[in-house]
Amino acid sequence: MDSTAFVGAAAPLRVAAAARSTICMAAADDKPVVSRRAALTGAAAAALAAVAGSLPALAETEYANVPFLGGSVIIDINNANVRAYAKYPGMYPTVAGLIATNGPFETVSDLYKIPGLTDLQIATLKKYEDKLVALTPTPEYELDKVNNGLYR
């Protein structure tokens, strides 16, 4: 009877007859081991899955207006966090909080329609009006406008 045994790399290997099943028995402990065919099939399937899985996801990876969230001189009043206004004296925290909680705004001039603004707050808004822009509100940044979870 023809048998197949996997002993080591240098050991002679006898090929099993074609009618035999793909599971072989190890000579040492008679436990089933995976045949070469099954191992190669599994490796080919894994390689195919790796290639198929490397196709690009068609998702937006970065918000195009990230610089206006506080990383530049101009701040987006519809998406920026209140901390972004700290670079302009008089804006943080009160005026910034009013902007974050009363938006969205169509234009920067809509800021003057916020109810309850004091004369000093209006003067502060006028002072930094050229540093503000009203971009399209993005839902991903709505929760982060007041508290983005970043602390010193």
From Swiss-Prot:
What's the chief localization of this chain?
plastid
Keyword hit for Thylakoid? yes
Give the UniProt record's GO annotations in the biological process aspect.
Answer: photosynthesis; photosystem II stabilization
PTM statement from Swiss-Prot or TrEMBL: Predicted to be translocated into the thylakoid lumen by the Tat system.
- Localization: Plastid, Chloroplast thylakoid membrane
Membrane topology category: Peripheral membrane protein
Concerning InterPro entries, the annotation shows: PSII_PsbU (IPR010527), TAT_signal (IPR006311)
Coiled-coil annotation reads none
Q: Which Gene3D superfamilies match?
A: Photosystem II 12 kDa extrinsic protein
Which keywords does this chain's UniProt record carry? Chloroplast, Membrane, Plastid, Thylakoid, Transit peptide
- Cellular component GO terms, alphabetical: chloroplast thylakoid membrane; extrinsic component of membrane; photosystem II
Q: How does it assemble?
A: PSII is composed of 1 copy each of membrane proteins PsbA, PsbB, PsbC, PsbD, PsbE, PsbF, PsbH, PsbI, PsbJ, PsbK, PsbL, PsbM, PsbT, PsbX, PsbY, PsbZ, Psb30/Ycf12, at least 3 peripheral proteins of the oxygen-evolving complex and a large number of cofactors. It forms dimeric complexes. The oxygen-evolving complex in red algae is composed of PsbO (OEC33), PsbQ', cytochrome c-550 and PsbU.
Protein name, per record: Photosystem II extrinsic protein U, chloroplastic
* Organism expressing this protein natively: Pyropia yezoensis
